[in-house]
Amino acid sequence: MMRKHPYEILLDRKRKWSPVKPTVGVIRDEARATIGRALAARHLELPVGAFITEGLEKDVPDNARKLLIDNVKDEERHDLALGYYADAFGTNENDEKEGKLLRDAWINHPDHTITKALVAERSIFFVLLPFFRFNGCAALRTISAYISRDEQIHVGANSLVCRELGLRPSPSLDKLRKATINWIVKPLGINTKDRYLDKKFWTDASDRLMYEGKAPEFSETQRARMPAFFEHSNVNLPKYA
């Protein structure tokens, strides 16, 4: 029996789901402004998909193409799910404007598109999703859990592609990554009693994910309480394909 390629293994791990329009539950006051900014960062979801699509037109390994094409569909699903939640949560005009300016900065950055996708997913999305898990309502925690499962596969795929092609992020892309995460968590405090409301906790996590590819401080995410079914209105439960 032939061993499956890592790209095939990642593809086999996927589980389709469909976003639904949620109802917003109780949100911690201290986290509300940052959640608003993090939701504005959803404008990066479709560009990340476009980065992958553009990469497919270049020198991406042939055996990665099926997985990457499917990953683009995931990004469209994530954009829809977060858009539904943002509509229910309420958007801030200034946050939306800044989110789109950051989106444009990522689009216009000259690094390879797969590199940009990897950095955005590993060092931005991998920070925002745990933030939603620790500070969001039941609906937002559920959305973040489903997106997180997809993003683990995306980061695995993009890491393999970058390794095969010898791609590394430039210092200017790292600077853009820092500017992005710093803007999102700016409303949080410093040296707070609750570390999940501490700005430095989240910026440090982004740095470690960027430079080390891991953030041990997120080990609690695996044990973070997931919403029980009885906590939800049925409209908050994703639909499976």
For each predicted feature, which ranges?
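Non-heme di-metal
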Residues: 1-241
